[in-house]
A protein has these predicted regions:
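A mature extracytoplasmic/lumenal domain signature
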Residues: 12-14, 31, 86-90, 98, ...
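Small/polar-residue-rich segments within soluble enzyme cores
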Residues: 1-79
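Beta-lactam-recognizing serine transpeptidase/beta-lactamase-like catalytic domain environment
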Residues: 61-73, 86, 112, 116-157, ...
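Conserved, well-ordered alpha-helix/loop/beta-strand core segments that scaffold catalytic motifs
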Residues: 2, 67-110
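Short, small/polar residue-rich loop motifs at catalytic or cofactor-binding pockets
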Residues: 53, 106-109, 180
């Protein structure tokens, strides 16, 4: 630079530093060249966070040096602040417990989301494995994937309250309606549904308490397929969560007209449907 070689210039660059490191990396993401968001909130809210450069008209000499400032063409605009709903204490707790659970169960990966049940706000979102956005040059690309939003799975028995709610709303059962689960099996065509433990006759309330697959299937089969589908669709199954994060998926809820009886039965306890966290 001291030689004043034409075309060789010095440029000041800035880089974000993320105090939470790998604990919140999948939420915050990171920026790349020229401070442009590449992942997470940094990418999803790039338009809000990024400032707008200004410009001025001036005169420079043949060495590229400014010799006269003539006028301002456009004033620069600073980026705006963005407040998240994350609770830092819960985020650290979620990260710690998820890491421990993945390691204890020798799992390949895991995700954890904590929501405020009243507002729906995300209080914590963690993934393992993770990466440190402050030294991401050493991180494998797969570690940057926000599995809580991009990966889908069958929700299993966590779906039972929704299928039973559909029947309660439709008036086909009441909380105290008896449901015969027999010896804990139910055969539909060539397939047989099993309960972990035979429980005989259960009330609808007990079907949830005991997590009876047979009971949930019988309750669901007492509904028109479209009724069950509508309840699941109304609460958001089969649609993206609309968090604004890049790569989020919607899961899968097939149209009711394509369901076979066994599919309606197994869907009542969370099989044959896919969701993200």
């Amino acid at each position: 630079l001291a030689l004043r070689i034409r075309g060789l210039n010095e440029e000041t660059a800035f880089r974000r530093y993320y105090p939470a490191g790998d604990v919140a990396s999948h939420v915050l993401g990171f920026t790349g060249d020229r401070d442009a968001g590449q992942e997470g909130i940094e990418l999803a809210q790039q338009g809000w966070l990024a400032g707008v450069p200004g410009s001025r008209r001036g005169i420079i000499n043949r060495r590229g040096e400014a010799v006269e400032d003539v006028a301002s063409i456009r004033a620069p605009q600073e980026g705006r602040d963005l407040a998240l709903s994350l609770d830092s204490r819960l985020q650290y707790l979620a990260f710690r417990e998820l890491k421990a659970a993945v390691e204890a169960n020798r799992a390949k990966a895991g995700g954890l989301v904590i929501l405020d049940a009243r507002s729906g706000e995300i209080l914590a979102l963690a993934n393992w494995p993770t990466y440190n956005p402050n030294s991401r040059d050493r991180a494998a690309r797969d570690r940057m994937r926000n599995r809580a939003l991009t990966d889908v799975f069958e929700p299993g028995s966590t779906l039972k309250p929704f299928s039973i709610a559909a029947a309660l709303d439709a008036g086909t059962v009441r909380p105290d309606t008896p449901i015969a689960t027999g010896g804990g099996t139910l055969t539909i065509g060539s397939a047989t549904i099993h309960d972990a433990h035979p429980a005989g006759t259960l009330t609808v309330e007990q079907v949830i308490q005991k997590s009876s697959n047979v009971g949930a299937a019988k309750i669901a089969l007492g509904l028109p397929a479209q009724t069950l589908w509508k309840t699941l669709a109304d609460v958001g199954f089969g649609t993206p969560p609309k968090t604004g994060f890049p790569g989020e998926v919607s899961g899968r809820l097939r149209p009711a007209k394509s369901w076979k009886p066994i599919e309606q039965a197994t869907m009542s306890y969370g099989h044959g449907i896919s969701v993200n966290l």
